[in-house]
Amino acid sequence: MQSSGFAGLRIGVTGAGGSFGQALLRQLHQQGASLVALRHGGAALELRDGAGALIPVETVAWQVGEEQQLTELLAKLQILVINHGINVMGARDREATRLSLEVNTLSALRLLELFLASPNPGGQRREIWVNTSEAEVNPAFSPLYEISKRTLGQLVSLRSLDAPWPVRRLVLGPFRSALNPYGFMDAERVAAAVVAQVLAGRELVIVSPNPLTWLLMPLAALGRRLYFSWFTRRPDP
């Protein structure tokens, strides 16, 4: 049975083929959203609900480094969820470093900037969600993953100061996925908790069993906001 929390909103999700991406799409469908799955490769996403029925979802293929090609699509979305990523685990070579920064940080930043710059002539509700993970403030036992996600988190804090609409940060604990086969949280429950917190109006969305995350992340977010506000200038109109 559908609710109406996101009724009529067109929502795009990157990393839509992953466990959390699919779980989030299912939760958004239950809230009445029109779904767009942004994923690498040309295969259409086949998404089913708990009863096994197919969920209508538009699949759009894209590649890291080619974000500009999504400009027209992004202008037609009310909500963009930046959720894609890569985890090279214990690697520390040149290519692993490049990939981690390109996929986890720079690609996400390019999408963020494109969405923030897209026109909104009708004054519709618009917002962007960025999955930075609790690696922002806690060890993930994957140094390059931590570095790339923490850098993304810093940039999200900076760009949020001048954003024309809400930028929500998703700080998620270890759920089972291809990126983290050792995760113990269920992606479906994590996605349900994310949607519930967004509907409650939270911009800092935390889903984690780790009490340190709940303590450190709000402090980090507040500290960055104050620091960036004090030592940076507003952009020229």
Where are each of the predicted segments found?
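Rossmann-fold scaffold of SDR-type NAD(P)-dependent oxidoreductases
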Residues: 14, 77-86, 104, 130
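N-terminal Rossmann NAD(P)H-binding glycine-rich loop of SDR-like oxidoreductase domains
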Residues: 14-27
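Conserved glycine-rich Rossmann-like NAD(P)H-binding loop of the short-chain dehydrogenase/reductase
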Residues: 30-47
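Rossmann-fold cofactor-recognition segment
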Residues: 49-68
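Short alpha-helix in the Rossmann-fold core of NAD(P)-dependent oxidoreductases
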Residues: 85, 100-112, 148-149
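Catalytic loop of short-chain dehydrogenase/reductase
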Residues: 89-90, 120-161, 174-179
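Short alpha-helical oligomerization interface
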Residues: 90-104
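C-terminal helical subdomain
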Residues: 165, 177-228
